[in-house]
Amino acid sequence: MQPKIPWPNNKQFAFTIFDDTDRANLKDNQLVYQCLNELNFKTTKSVWMTDGNKPTKDSGVTCDDKIYLNWLLELKNKGFEIGYHNTTYHSSYRQEIKEGLEKFVKIFNHSPAVMANHSANQENIYWGSHRVSGSRRAIYNILTRFKKNKFYKGHNESSPYFWGDLCRKHITYVRNFVFSDINTLKCCPFMPYRDLTKPYVNYWFASSEGNNVKMFNKCVSDKNQDRLEEEGGACIMYTHFADGFCQNGELSEKFKKQMKRLSKKNGWFVPVSTLLDFLKKEIKAQEINPKQRRALEWKWLFDKLILGST
């Protein structure tokens, strides 16, 4: 059994959210984050830096929208974290990625501490079949019908999509595996971790599955909240706040109810990188070994069979 973490300020557990910006719009975002702020949750909101020139099904508002950008800066001033979700909602070449990262630094006065790959983008780093190794890669390719075997090239130095050195320079934490369990730390007790087989990423972290409002509310059920508290664990929920949390200008009542209940517990509610910075010192962040990597990959593949895309 993993020993309990002595959380800051005598808190009993930790909880945060990484909000994937796919399909986001300002009006719905404002409703969600007003609720989170009122309940004293400080979480991570990812962004795209520029409007793309090829609209996709995932297209959403970007930092090119001045009203949205001003709202992001207000959000940051309230204690929320701004994370990175690639340059835009479609593939970008190296120079475009470089310019996107420089724009992030210029706007927010620091590099993005935390990021998640956007599934449609070829510049994703160590993504698709490259997330796993050995026999797990073969199984992954069968599950995905080999569609993502050689699609992602962000770590490939010979590719025009290569930006591995820029990732290592700018970004501290990159999200990889997602699990159905609310206690992310229980699933990945050594996060954040280094992986010597993936040298362009400084540290990896895992998360818990809350892809849309239904899955989010299921993961933060009363029973799961209580268990997270009892286990003294840490949850990094991965979600898309654009997916069902707001309908006709109204925020999900179930979401509000669950988050209000959670807010009354003695939890540490900080942004993703704040939580990972603490864990890095507390756990003395390490290089993952082959045995740990195998176990993590098998667990993720098992969850993937149940959850689908993670």
Annotated model-derived regions:
Residues W204-A206:
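A solvent-exposed, charged loop/short amphipathic helix patch at secondary-structure junctions
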Residues E209-N212:
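Propeptides and adjacent flexible N-terminal/non-core segments of secreted
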Residues M1-V201, K214-Y238, G244-T310:
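Catalytic alpha-helical scaffold of carbohydrate-active enzymes acting on polysaccharides/glycoconjugates
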